[in-house]
Amino acid sequence: MNSLIKPEGYKPSLDIRMTEVAIKKTKDYFESELAKELNLTRVSAPLFVRPETGLNDNLNGVERPVAFDVKGIGGDTVEVVHSLAKWKRMALKRYGFAPGEGLYTDMNAIRRDEDMDNLHSVYVDQWDWEQIILKSERTEETLKTIVSKIFSVFKRTENYLSGLYPNLQKYLPEDIFFVTTQELEDMYPELTPKERETALAKEKKAIFIMKIGDTLKSGIKHDGRAPDYDDWALNGDIVFYYPVLDLAYEVSSMGIRVDEDSLVAQLKKAGCEDRKNLKFHKELINKELPYTIGGGIGQSRICMFFLGKAHIGEVQASIWSDDMISECSQHNIQLL
C-alpha cells in the first residue's frame, strides 16, 4: 500500500545538487555534535548477523528480515539487520566501555515490509547509539536528561543550517515537551494514537512521548515495541511537528534498555519466552551485559526535516513504485 501526501504549491528550497551538498553538511555537523554531547565513539557496525545470536531487531515482530546464505561459512544463513539495538549492548561490553561512555554507528538497514510513503523507505539509514549507565540511573530523570541533550543537538543543527541557507524555515521551539502515552490517550481519547501525536505536536512543536509498548487503559497499545531492548516504562519517541506535511514527525526512537527483570516480564507479555534461550538474552538474564540507554536517529529523516523536503526520497536514493515516482514528478518532488 503506497500513500503519498502532495503538499499544495510545494517548491523545494534547494535544487538537487545543492541538496546533495546540504545533506553532507547536515550529517557531518549533527554527527559531530551528537558524539560530543553524549560522549560517544564511532565504531564499525555489521550489515548482517547470524539469526541464532538473537541480535537482530524484531521491530514489531512481524517484519521479515532479508536473509541469504553465505558460501564461506558453510552455506549458513545470515540476516540483514533491521537495527542494531541489541548488537550495540554486546559491543559496549566487548570493547571495554565504562559508565558514562558510549558508541555510535552509521547503521544501514533494509526493511522489506515497510509501507512506503513520504516518510518511509525500504532503505533505512540512522545513527544507532548506546551509552553505559549504572543500574541506579535507570530512571525517568536520566531518560529526560539525555532527551534534552539530544534536543539541544537538533537546535544547534537547525541554527547552523539556517546560517548556511537563510531561505530554510526553522520549526523547533526552545524546549521539548514530555508526555506519556497514557496522558496522551487521556487528553485525546477520541483520536487514534497517530492523530494524538499530531494534535499535541502541532501545539508544542517538539514532544517526547514516553512509555511505548505496553497496553494502555483502553486496552490498546500506543505503538508496538520489541520486548527485548527498550524497557517499555523507560522509553519514548522524539517527535516534531512538520508543517510541510502537517503531521507528527518522528526523528528518534530511544530508551533505557531492559534489565534482567524487565526483559523476562516483557518477553512473557509478548509471548516470546522462547527467546530466553538465545545468546544475547541469556547473557542479559545472567547480568553479563552492561545497563544502557540508547536509540536510533534517522539520518534521512533529519535531512528531510531541516531541508524542508516533502519526501524522504528527496534526501536518499531508494526504490519507489512507478505510480509514486510519477506522482512525485507531477508535484515538484525531486526524488534522488
Curated annotation (Swiss-Prot):
Catalytic activity, EC: 6.3.1.1
SUPFAM superfamilies cross-referenced by the UniProt entry: Class II aaRS and biotin synthetases (SSF55681)
GO terms of molecular function: aspartate-ammonia ligase activity; ATP binding; catalytic activity, acting on a protein; transferase activity
InterPro entries, A to Z: aa-tRNA-synth_II (IPR006195), aa-tRNA-synth_II/BPL/LPL (IPR045864), AsnA (IPR004618)
Any one of the GO CC terms: cytosol
Main location (coarse class): cytoplasm
Catalyzed reactions per annotation: L-aspartate + NH4(+) + ATP = L-asparagine + AMP + diphosphate + H(+)
Keyword entries, A-Z: Amino-acid biosynthesis, Asparagine biosynthesis, ATP-binding, Cytoplasm, Ligase, Nucleotide-binding
CDD domains tied to this protein: AsnA
Residues annotated as signal peptide: none
EC class (word): ligase
Gene Ontology process terms (BP): L-asparagine biosynthetic process
Pathway(s) served: Amino-acid biosynthesis; L-asparagine biosynthesis; L-asparagine from L-aspartate (ammonia route): step 1/1
Subcellular compartments: Cytoplasm
One Pfam family matching this protein: AsnA
Gene3D superfamilies listed in its UniProt record: Bira Bifunctional Protein, Domain 2
Record-stated family: Belongs to the class-II aminoacyl-tRNA synthetase family. AsnA subfamily.
PANTHER family: ASPARTATE--AMMONIA LIGASE (PTHR30073:SF5)
Name used for this protein in its record: Aspartate--ammonia ligase
Organism of origin: Ruminiclostridium cellulolyticum (strain ATCC 35319 / DSM 5812 / JCM 6584 / H10)
Gene (UniProt): asnA
